[in-house]
Amino acid sequence: DTLIEKRFKDPDLSDKNKKAFRVGYGLGVDHVGGTPVLQVPDKPDNDEVFLDGNSAVALGAASAGCNYITAYPMSPGTGVFTFFAKNAKLFSAVVEQVEDEISAINMVVGAAYAGARAMTTTSGGGFVLMCEGLSLAGITETPVVVHLAQRPGPATGLATRTEQADLELALYAGHGEFPRALYAPVNVES
């Protein structure tokens, strides 16, 4: 109740939101057999960090010296870009949202060619559009980082049978033979 009252100052609006929360929560409890839908543990009294995978990728990139990121938002990779945007000043990074994925990869190639530690982030459908720019990076021997947030199936949504289609696409993306390094983390440590 305290969180809802803090968010909604008007008593009438606060009461309506508390009622809506209780109804929704009750439906969730009934649906999963009497246990809460989501249990958030108390904050531990230590230096542990609680964050999602996209934030971890963004922090890792910033720690590695990434100082330029450009992207066209595409879930599930958008979180990396928005985390960078929110912390651009802290990371001393240039953050640029562009009109499409083709522009994003070409700007990353240009920035890297000029000496920036540059990256972009996307998902399968956006990565398909980046393949020609990836070929440009290959022919000019310009190192770029593309965060490809893998979807659970061959397109947006959840397929009947899941697969690693985005990873398969990344193995052979671009024209011609040039070196590629693919990293697919399997747990928090990697």
Predicted segments with their positions:
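Conserved thiamine diphosphate
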Residues: 161-190
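Aromatic-enriched
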Residues: 1-53
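Conserved short loop/turn motifs at secondary-structure junctions
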Residues: 4-9, 42-46, 68, 98, ...
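Thiamine diphosphate
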Residues: 68, 75-172
